[in-house]
Amino acid sequence: MSGFKQHTGLVVPLDAANVDTDAIIPKQFLQKVSRLGFGKHLFHDWRFLDDVGEQPNPEFVMNAPRYQGASILLARENFGCGSSREHAPWALADYGIKAMIAPSFADIFYGNSINNQMVPVRLTEQEVDEIFQFVEANEGAEVEVDLEANVVRANGKEYGFEIDSFRRHCLLNGLDNIGLTLQHEDKIAEYEANIPSFLS
């Protein structure tokens, strides 16, 4: 993984609270264990009027022409609640989402997003309101998420955010759980070479 330092992108404003993982990726699409291919099913029951994903719902914000190509998702509190399915961040990442901004995220979803190199940014409700107003009033509005400086830049303003230092390190350096383990590959090899024969 390449790591996340700064990203500037088009924002799609999903004005909904308590969006659960079943809404993000419905259960009928959870049959694969590969991370790829889930983007087309993202918010399926909201994005489409049919069961097979061929009739877009013109009322759903992500289908609006002005938000096509969005790479930052703006939402309300408790985003990603519900079951712990990792397919939810897989679907968002496969769709092209690089960062999410909301007042709060469900804990397991928050961790799973970081493991998949997406930055979940927690801002206050007032700050999120301001960004909603900016994005909805300005077609093509872009926002910058700067993980090195721990700020979001929008409409000439800077909004500071906090993130655990270990998780920030993983995001900046593109490290998932496997990558973290491989950082200690030499020590693992040394340990394995010294295991007594009766334990091997």
UniProtKB/Swiss-Prot annotation:
One of its GO terms (molecular function) is 3-isopropylmalate dehydratase activity. It comes from the Bacteria. Keywords: Amino-acid biosynthesis, Branched-chain amino acid biosynthesis, Leucine biosynthesis, Lyase. Pathway: Amino-acid biosynthesis; L-leucine biosynthesis; L-leucine from 3-methyl-2-oxobutanoate: step 2/4. It catalyses: (2R,3S)-3-isopropylmalate = (2S)-2-isopropylmalate. GO terms for biological process: L-leucine biosynthetic process. InterPro entries: 3-IsopropMal_deHydase_ssu, Aconitase/3IPM_dehydase_swvl, AconitaseA/IPMdHydase_ssu_swvl, IPMI_Swivel, LeuD. Its EC number is 4.2.1.33. NCBIfam families: leuD, PRK01641.1. This is 3-isopropylmalate dehydratase small subunit. It comes from Vibrio campbellii (strain ATCC BAA-1116). The lineage of its organism: Bacteria, Pseudomonadati, Pseudomonadota, Gammaproteobacteria, Vibrionales. The gene is leuD.
